[in-house]
């Protein structure tokens, strides 16, 4: 019997907490976000707490992730982006660990929920907007009118650019949530047929599952990278008005 592949995304209360009429219960989603944060902090503390001239494997892996983030900022924002390394690095690591936690058997994929990814996207959107106005003042609004636009086309271009700008949180959040959900649904559906397929195809389904799991891990890493690099592109608009 095929189990509902959407059950794995159910949010369950672990500790029921209510303050007046507000439900602020501690859920499996909150637990996995907390666990991912603690694990990430522990990982990078161990990687960088005692740096060596001849680095350990843990230090090398931590440096690779750090250099990846700094390269993203340098390539998309330039030297002015260095001050945003802590924010972008935290964003990338949090999404990466949450994505990878979903690959653990009986784990929970936090980033498959649009409310989580939308909250992250809104934070990026607010940061970009605030940085833009703080750095450029009202001149930041020139972002919505590309240089060289004919005067008669200006009203239409402003509307299009404004709509595109406001749609950024939706596109960022939907891309991440949809990709994580689709991949896990596919794995769940195929895994439910593995036992049946083994009767007819012997051990062939096992390598297939290994390949699919490997591909899903790749997607988890890729989606964290895409979310972060798009955040850098948006940040470039605020810093350099490009």
UniProtKB/Swiss-Prot annotation:
It is found in: Cell inner membrane. The chain crosses the membrane at residues 29-49, 84-104, 114-134, 140-160, 189-209, 210-230. CDD domains: ATP-synt_Fo_a_6 (cd00310). InterPro entries: ATP_synth_F0_asu, ATP_synth_F0_asu_AS, ATP_synth_F0_asu_bact/mt, F0_ATP_A_sf. Keywords: ATP synthesis, Cell inner membrane, Cell membrane, CF(0), Hydrogen ion transport, Ion transport, Membrane, Transmembrane, Transmembrane helix, Transport. It is a multi-pass membrane protein. One of its GO terms (molecular function) is proton-transporting ATP synthase activity, rotational mechanism. The keyword Repeat does not apply. Gene3D superfamilies: ATP synthase, F0 complex, subunit A. One of its GO terms (cellular component) is plasma membrane. It comes from the Bacteria. It holds the Pfam family ATP-synt_A. Key component of the proton channel; it plays a direct role in the translocation of protons across the membrane. F-type ATPases have 2 components, CF(1) - the catalytic core - and CF(0) - the membrane proton channel. CF(1) has five subunits: alpha(3), beta(3), gamma(1), delta(1), epsilon(1). CF(0) has three main subunits: a(1), b(2) and c(9-12). The alpha and beta chains form an alternating ring which encloses part of the gamma chain. CF(1) is attached to CF(0) by a central stalk formed by the gamma and epsilon chains, while a peripheral stalk is formed by the delta and b chains. PANTHER family: ATP SYNTHASE SUBUNIT A (PTHR11410:SF0). Belongs to the ATPase A chain family. This is ATP synthase subunit a. It comes from Rickettsia bellii (strain RML369-C).
